[in-house]
Swiss-Prot record:
Gene: slmA
Protein name: Nucleoid occlusion factor SlmA
Keywords: Cell cycle, Cell division, Cytoplasm, DNA-binding
InterPro entries, A to Z: DNA-bd_HTH_TetR-type_CS, Homeodomain-like_sf, HTH-type_Tx_Regulator, HTH_TetR, NO_SlmA, SlmA-like_C
Subcellular location: Cytoplasm, Nucleoid
Organism whose genome encodes this protein: Actinobacillus pleuropneumoniae serotype 5b (strain L20)
Family membership noted in the UniProt record: Belongs to the nucleoid occlusion factor SlmA family.
Lineage: Bacteria, Pseudomonadati, Pseudomonadota, Gammaproteobacteria, Pasteurellales
Amino acid sequence: MIQPTVKMPKKSVKERQQQVLEVLIGLLNSEDGMQRVTTERLAKAVGVSEGALYRYFPSKTKMFEALIERIEQTLTGYINASKRKENTTASTVKAILYTVIEFARKNPGVTRILTGHALMFEDDQLKARVAKFFDGLEFQFANILQMSKLREGKTFEDERALAGYLVNFCEGQFLRLVRSNFSYNQHQHFEKQWALIKPLFE
């Protein structure tokens, strides 16, 4: 008896885009994550031709942009959760710092993008996009500091400067992770580092 041929449904463009991004971040997360991800290498990992990749994204720059946008959305979700959960400005900032750094530790590929190490041979517009990401993070911190006036009656001399300092702290932790090839354990030092930051909120 001849068995009927069952055709597997083709993946939609959106599903293929998702697959490409997952494979891309997988390559960046790997031990070879510091090596340049060429379209040839990416296509091979996805299991399609290089030409097929460009049916899902017009350029590699667009792939990285989509990935950075996803990173931004994920971290914004975590930040909003911390804002809902915590009751004071200090505890909110501490929770966000811890969450952002933990996210960086668990996602080496993401961290390599945000420090620029994964973008060294890519379009300069991606570096501008990463700068925009950090500007957004600074805005989130500044907003939390401004809201403290309504929530706790507390004001800060320069919310933007303090927000910038908090972002610089995050960036420094990212760079330390990359430099140590993610062997650095920031949890051993976080409480002591926070003890130095906390007085800024008292």
